[in-house]
A protein has these predicted regions:
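Catalytic cores of enzyme domains
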Residues: 1-150
Length: 150
């Protein structure tokens, strides 16, 4: 909420879309205003084969947030197609084969690129065992390039 306060202190309206403010359907894993949509429309990156948001600099190792505001801001050109090449690391790493070979574009539904139910069920089972699954995120070659820089 510090970003919201900062913008308000500059004299603009602002509303941070926090987890509690951006209503989310946990069954479908969808929010009213999806951060990934905002980010692709702002030119920050694209949706990878894994349905995760991907940037050239960080790969899929990204956490998104959003602030609605009337403050003028600069943004890039909308990205409407995946910039992933023929790499299938995320797809190959998926333990439940939830990732489809279809590359993302902004005309597809999420279900066209990933079986979100299968993915969600696996993640829930892993969390019950005290684990998690970030295989698609960690195997993204752009994520690997970023991690090697550090």
């Amino acid at each position: 909420m510090k970003g919201e306060e900062y913008i308000k202190n500059l004299g603009y309206d602002a509303f941070a879309l926090t987890m509690t403010r951006n209503e989310c359907d946990m069954e479908k894993l969808l929010s009213i205003l999806p951060y990934k949509t905002i980010a692709t429309k702002s030119g920050l990156g694209w949706i990878g084969r894994s349905a995760l948001f991907v940037t050239p600099e960080y790969g899929a190792a990204v956490a998104l947030g959003a602030i609605l505001t009337d403050m003028p801001v600069e943004f890039g050109n909308p990205i409407t197609d995946s910039e992933c090449d023929d790499c299938t690391n995320c797809q190959d790493a998926c333990p439940v084969n939830a990732i489809n070979p279809q590359k993302w574009n902004d005309r597809l539904n999420r279900e066209d690129i990933i079986d979100i139910e299968t993915c969600k069920d696996y993640i829930i089972d892993q969390y019950k065992a005290g684990l998690g699954c970030t295989k698609c995120m960690s195997e993204c070659k752009l994520t690997q390039e970023y991690l090697k820089k550090e």
